[in-house]
Structures are given as structure tokens and as C-alpha cells.
Amino acid sequence: MLKLLLGDPNTRKLKRYQPIVEEINFLEEEISKLTDDELRQETHNLKSQISSESDIKQQKELLDESLPKAFAIVREASKRVLDMRHFDVQLIGGMVLHECQIAEMKTGEGKTLVATLPCYLNALTGKGVHVVTVNDYLARRDAEWMGQVHRFLGLSVGLIQQDMSPVQRKKNYDCDITYATNSELGFDYLRDNMSTDINEVVQRPFNYCVIDEVDSILIDEARTPLIISGQVERPQEKYQKASELALALVKAKEIGKDGIDPEGDYEVDEKQRSCILTDQGFAKCEEYLAVSDLYNPKDPWAHYITNALKAKELFIKDVNYIIKNNEAVIVDEFTGRVMPGRRWSDGQHQAIEAKESLKIQPETQTLASITYQNFFLLYPGLAGMTGTAKTEEVEFEKTYKLESTVIPTNQIRKREDLPDQVFKTEIGKWKAVARETAQIHRAGRPVLVGTTSVEKSELLSSLLAEEKIPHNLLNAKPENVEREAEIVAQAGRAGAVTIATNMAGRGTDIILGGNSDYMARLKLKEILIPLLVKPNNEHKPPIPKQRSSKSKGGFSSKVGSNLTKNIPDYSTSLFPCKLDEEIQKKLSVLSDELVKNWGDRQLSVLDLDDRIATAAEKAPTEDKMIKLLRESLSRVKDEYEKVLTHEEKKVREVGGLHVIGTERHESRRVDNQLRGRAGRQGDFGSTRFFLSLEDNLLRIFGGERVANLMNAFRVDEDMPIESGMLTRSLESAQKKVETYYYDIRKQVFEYDEVMNNQRKAVYSERLRVLQGTDLKRQVIGYGERTMYEIVEAYINPDLPPEEWDIAQLISKVKEFIYLLDDLKADDVKLLSIEELKNYLQEQLRTAYDLKESQIEQIRPGLMREAERFFILQQIDNLWREHLQSMDSLRESVGLRGYGQKDPLIEYKNEGYDMFLEMMTNMRRNVIYSMFMFQPKTDKDDKN
């Protein structure tokens, strides 16, 4: 009703931007007359004007005033460098981002290009801008591709990659605009706050940040905190024994109700992802291990057994993890990518290693941690882009104070979303998927099939191989990951079939007919790798292995001949045609030149990738080799383009890309992302989901209602079921899951909020120490506070002065400050409490000056170094112990709910007390260490 009366709030919001769009369009003609150098000068003038304003509010107003001109400059630069002009809707997207909101833009609407607008504008402050992507490949692609626009305008562009040294990182963070992944940014922040020298700190204070695929980072990954950990030795045989025991235990067929244990040794709750021993199971374990109590603190077993049971029942090989180089590597459930270097905590990873008979790595202890939620809230300006934000609008608003605005598409969507097909059994569903894939493939349309795990993608792969359908597989297996971009680049070719796990290639558009730019790069890579790359540099050839060797170009032979008559017989599985002799000769000359200049097999694969990517740019270059490479790339691309343009036309005629979903994801948003692959930028396309009543989502969250439906449907397994009740069950299951995970994220956020305030206090204290501004005053401050606390502890103001325990107080003071050895009770017994505090603080300052003169005689500057060392040492040690204590508190506090107490309030109160105690200990330990500090001198060494 309100919508009818007031109109759609999103539409009202968009109208507000229209006059600014008109102003930018008006400026376009004026800006287009400027030379390249004049454009750069405009940037310089704007930057000088904005960065010189020290008042933050005034600076923000200046930025807003400069927006039309800045956007017009970026649009012009983009036309000149990328041959891409921002549409009006993209300008609106840029304004939404500048206002620190989330811009929801459909797949293929050019989100990456939109980001150039607010990034350029906010970089004019000179405080740095971060562009965040979900993986290293996308960060590099965007820094190379969009970075051209910024470099052309005279701004510096940085890129953070996994294997960079601290020096390289610092240099890149100091650039005007820096591209990085969320995990690199987060870990650098934690490492900076563990460094012992200000020169080791790589990041500047945060300013403005744009997150690409914001839903993936702020929502999907919000449940997992970033943790830096150190190793702790734990007995490995316990993991092995627990793993053997888990195999011997019998799972209960159902979950116990009303406190009554079911038949079996343990029950599994898939929804809560937990395993609980029954009384019978406890007895069996105690007998097997010959112990009387699994929870005995001196010899605990319960934790090991629970982890072993979870490894057996809930952590499935090729779904949750894969085995690579004799290590268990985690697979991200949202992107389907492997996450090397990441490990499950609390001994869970070790339990999986024991289950798979791998070498068990030592357990770890947390040294520093932060959640993505609290990390990104450190940015004064935060904005994000995604194709799907509306489903999580409330969470963005509540947790991050971020509004979502839907940006209209530039062209009308022509995608057809076909009704779901639901099957009784999983095998019936997979057969139907294979049938539909074969049918669409034979019609000459490209097909993209999204699966939820490595295991399922390989099952479908084998079904298609039986049907002799050539296809590409894109999942977390190492041999497929390397070819991610290559596979997606050709996924739009006629009849191509691509199976992808959770659309791992998000970020690379599927272009109907195939992506000539990527194919040209790959052709050059194929020629140059054997000549330029070091032989020991591990690399798989980038040529996708089609599953059917007889077919050409990803088509069945019949389709290949019908659709692509102009493609010669000798086309390979990736490249659309053979290059003519003239181009081949040129490539041969190029190879010889590059070997002469870059050396025979001297580069790494990454180096070569970078150089080919630079050559693919349009940015000006003086490098002769890059120019040669660019010319060859252009020739190869033009050659491929001729064939692919014809192919694109054919693909459009038969209906465009068809996307098949094989399971509803836990989040409707991920389903929408998969659908969004078809029908980009007004292309034709279609989507359909195939589901079964045995799918995880319905099985775990659908409840008894779905189980009853299964029995009610007396239909064959390969007969699709259509039922309104079923569709409603499905939607309610999905909403249930979304609410369930939202509650988990909310809880993670609320608990981490307590840690966050403590973390900020500790990290700002550390930074003060690293910057070294007046360390002496800081340490004396610690000492004065300690003297104050000693007086408060030993003097009771309610007692008369003659009953005060002055002797005990003086003894305590001397424990901390041995230089006050001649201090006597008689010196202070006539003083009031305030006078006593002032007197002791005065004595402390005098003693500290004396200590300083002793130390400085040994070596000037040594006292400041000692102060820095002891403060950092104490902060780090006590913070590490505090993190451990807070973890234990969090685990135990949940039980207080049974005593009618709010666990979160209890956690806040006790956590605060523990934090105050930690800070007190830190101050006292520093004072004690400083006075006890006795450096060795040359005389000591001679003696």
C-alpha cells in the first residue's frame, strides 16, 4: 500500500542522481577536447586542491562538488584507453558507491568499470583507496585492466599478491589505488599489529574501500574469522587412536528426543554440524581407552573423540576438502575453490589428517584474529558491488550500516527462467541433468552446469562421458583450477559444455561465441612457455582437456560440422582456427626476439603471465618487447575474432547460454548468481534447476514434511514431480537456512564486537609504541598508575592512619623498584592517602631518571630500545594468553543460559574484567622489567 502511495523508494533514490548524470553528460564534450596531457593536468589540479584540505568534513564536501568533473574525466580516459564508455546507469552506480552504499548490478553490466569512478574520485584525497576482490586472479586482472585508466590519468596503482615480500607490499599499499583480496588485507592488518618495528608496518591508515562481490566477502565469509596462529605441541597418538575408535563406533539412526538416547554409540546433527556420544558410546570409549573419565583435565579424550566423529561423518573428502600433495586442503563451500594454507582450528584438521592417514601437523594457538565484519568496519568509507544484494539487504543495513540500491540494467533482460524439475531420487535427477545437457548441446547451444561439490561435478562428468558429450570440468581439483579463466573464456562457444563447482570462475564473463582476447593470450602462452619459462617452474599446459578426444572445439562432431562450416578440420579443442602461415612466421620471429631479450627459459609462469597481460592492455609503453608482443596478440585476436563473430551469431540464433543448477544452495543469492551467468547485457539465455528430494537442503532443513512427501509420491525416479506444496517447502527450507546462518553470523559479530573494542585498545597502544613518540612518558605513566594501584590495594581509607599497613606497602613498592631500597616506612607515615600517592609517584620518576642515566652510559639510545622491546613483549605475550582465555570463556559461557542468564552479557562483563586485569599486568610487568634490566657490558664479557 505504502509503495503505491509513495512510489518505489529505489526509484525515488535513482531520480535523485539524474541531474548529476545530465551534468556529467554536459561536461563530456568539453572534456573530450582535452589532450592526454591536459587530462593528466586536470587530475593533478583536483588532487592538489582536495588533498591539501585538512578538515575531513570540508574535504568530503570538496569531493562531492568535484564528482561531476571527476566522473567525466574517468569516462573520457576509459574511452581512450579501454575503448569503453561508461553508460548513464554505470555513472549512477559510481555515485551510489561514492556515497558508501551497495550497488546491486546484474552480471555483465560492467561492475568492474563502475568501480573506476569512485576509486578515482576518492584517490584524489591522497589517503589511498582499496579495491577488494575474492581471489588473487581477479585482483591481478582488475589492477592490470582497470588500472590502465588510473595510470593514464597519472595516479599510481598497486597490487597485493600472496607471495609478495613486506617491502613490495608497503610500496603497493602506498599507491593511490591498491587492488587486493580480502584475506591479504586482513592478514596484513594483523601482521602489522604484531610487528616489532615501525618500518615493518606495510599498511597506511584506512580511508575508502570498494568491495567487489560484497555479498561473498561480508556475508558468506563472515562466519570464519581471520586467524594468525603459532604452533603448539599436542600428542599425535591421541588423534590416531581417536580416529580408530570413531570407526568402531556405531551411528544412531535418529536423533534422541526428550533426553532419551537413541540406539547407537553417537548421534549426528547435520543442521548444527555436531556429533554427540550417547551413554552407551561413553561407556564403549572408556572401555576401549581404559580410562574412567573422558573429561579428565589431566588426560582429556572427549575433544579428540568428538573431532574424530565429525571428521568421519561431517567432513567429506572431495566435498569439504581434497587431498593434494599428501595434505588435506579445505574447499570453500561458497566458491568451490581450494584454500591452501588455511586449516580448521581446535584440532579438527588434525582429526581429518588422522582419518586420511596423512602426516599430522602440530595444533596451533591463536596469536591474532579478527572477523571480516569488524575488519571492514575499520574503513571510514566502505562501499560494495554485487549482482545479488536484495536478499541480504537487512543484514547489510544492520551489521554494516550499508544501504543497498538496485541499479537498472542498460538493456532489457531476455533470460528465461524455466520452472524447477524435482525428482524423487538423486540418481534420477543426475540422469535428467545429463539428458538435458546432451539435448541442449546437440542443438548447438553452450551449457553451463553448476554443481555444489567436487564429487558431484565428477559424477556428472562420468555420466556425460558415457553419453560421449565433450565437456570441461572446473572445480577445486588442482589440475582444473589453473585453467579457470581459460575454461570460462570458451564456455560460450557453440555446443560447449562446462561443469563448474559453485561457479568458481565468477568474475570472468561468459561471452557468447567465445572470448577471442583470452584465446589469443593463451595461444601466445602455449608458444612461449617452452621457450621462456624455467623448466623447474611447475605448470600444467593451459589447454583444457576435453573429455571427448574425437570432437572439435567442444562440439559433438555433428554440431561442429553444422554450426561452424568455416572452421577448418584441424581446429584444436580450444583455439577456433589454425593461424595462417604469415602470422605463424611472425610468431616465430617474436619468439626469437623475446628469447634474446628475456633470456632462454629464465622467467616464472607468473612473470610471463604479467608480461602478456601488460601487452594486452592499451596503456602507453616504451618497452620494445611489450610492443612486439602487443602487435602479435592483436593479429592473433583478429584472426580468431573472424571465426568467433560468426559463431556468436549462430549461438544467439539458437537461444544463447543455458544454465543448469543441480541443487538449491543454502542461500537464494548463490542460486541467483548462477542464473545471472545467462542473458548478460541483453543476450538471450535460459536457466533451469534440477532438484531431488534427497538433496541436502531438503533433507536437513525440509523436516518431516518432505520425508512424508517422499513416501507419498509413488513415481519413477526419472519422472519429474511438480507440486505447489513441494515448491513452498523448498522456499521455506531456503529461508530457514538463511535465517539460521544469519543468526550464527549475528552471534559471531556480537561476540567479536566485545573482542573488537579490546583489540582496538591494544593495537592503538602498540602503534604508539612502534611510532616511538615519547616512550619514556608512557613507561613513567605505567609506573605512576602502578604506584596508585599499590596504595589503593594496601591502604583502607576507612581505617585511621596508624592502622595502615605501611611496611607491607613499602615492601611491595621495593619489589617493583629496587632502586628505592633506602625508602623507609617512617618517610611516609605522616602523609595522607593523596600525598602518599604523589610522593611514591615522585620517587618513581626520580628512580627512573637514575636508571636511565645508568643505561645510557652503556650506549646512548639503549633505554628507548629497551622500553620499546619490553612494552611490545608484554603486550604480545599477555594478549596471546588473553585470546586463549576469551576463547575458553566463550565456550563455557553458553551453559549459563540454563541458569537464566544472558550468555552475551556474561561474556561482556567477564571479558571486560579479564581485559582490565591483562592491561594492569602489562603495566606492572613493564615497570618491573625496566628496573630489572641489566644489559651486559664489554667489561662483563671480559670477566
Swiss-Prot record:
Membrane topology reported for the UniProt record: Peripheral membrane protein
Keywords, in A-Z order: ATP-binding, Cell inner membrane, Cell membrane, Cytoplasm, Membrane, Nucleotide-binding, Protein transport, Thylakoid, Translocase, Translocation, Transport
Pfam families per UniProt: P-loop_SecA (PF21090), SecA_DEAD (PF07517), SecA_PP_bind (PF01043), SecA_SW (PF07516)
E.C. number(s) listed in UniProt: 7.4.2.8
Low complexity biased stretches: 551-560
Catalysed reaction, written as an equation: ATP + H2O + cellular proteinSide 1 = ADP + phosphate + cellular proteinSide 2
Record's subcellular location: Cell inner membrane; Cellular thylakoid membrane; Cytoplasm
A cellular component term, taken from the record's GO annotations: cytosol
Region ranges (Disordered): 535-560
Top-level taxon: Bacteria
Single annotated GO MF: ATP binding
Positions bound to ATP: Q90, G108, E109, G110, K111, T112, D509
GO term, biological process aspect, one: protein import
Annotated function: Part of the Sec protein translocase complex. Interacts with the SecYEG preprotein conducting channel. Has a central role in coupling the hydrolysis of ATP to the transfer of proteins into and across the cell membrane, serving as an ATP-driven molecular motor driving the stepwise translocation of polypeptide chains across the membrane. Probably participates in protein translocation into and across both the cytoplasmic and thylakoid membranes in cyanobacterial cells.
Entry similarity comment: Belongs to the SecA family.
Subunit field text: Monomer and homodimer. Part of the essential Sec protein translocation apparatus which comprises SecA, SecYEG and auxiliary proteins SecDF. Other proteins may also be involved.
Protein's recorded name: Protein translocase subunit SecA
Provenance organism: Prochlorococcus marinus (strain MIT 9312)
Gene name tied to this protein: secA
